[in-house]
Amino acid sequence: MEKSVLRKEMKRLRREMTAEERKIRDEKIFENLTTLSRFKDKKWFYIYVSYGTETDTKEIIKYLLSLKDKKDIHIAVPKVLGTEMEFFEIDSLDELKKSNMGILEPNNHRLVNVKDVEYFERLNPAENVVMILPGLAFDIERGRAGYGGGFYDKYLNRYGADDFLKIGICYDFQM
């Protein structure tokens, strides 16, 4: 199937879910992700802030933020800067504001990435970093169809896609 057709179909299927279906599916994704040992053991969490009909990540972010008092962990969320995307560390959802596109983005300047953060010099990114990726569709070969802007692809190419764990989250019909 052509990517543009696939994107349109996945958006349609997500829009057609009832609020109750979405809630049940989001809760299951939350449970599956937060109990995954490869997820729980990380120190840096790069995670998108859900928008519209995307798989909900706000509850995941709240959960991670609640762990900061108990564990040495860091949460970073993306912000689009022109044609690029960067991640900024947050300590609260209150640090987010709506962009021109209506997407919640960090309203601070604590830029982090897997190559520049001094903290990473003491860490092995493969052991300590996870990125939660959005997507409209995923395949069994770990391929991902995003929204077509290439922001995540460019970011991963710039900073080394093989350096850390990446987890795509979606509803079952998106695979």
PLM region spans:
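N-terminal active-site beta-alpha-beta segment that forms phosphate/nucleotide-binding
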Residues: 1-123
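Conserved phosphate- and dinucleotide-binding cores of soluble alpha/beta proteins
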Residues: 86-175
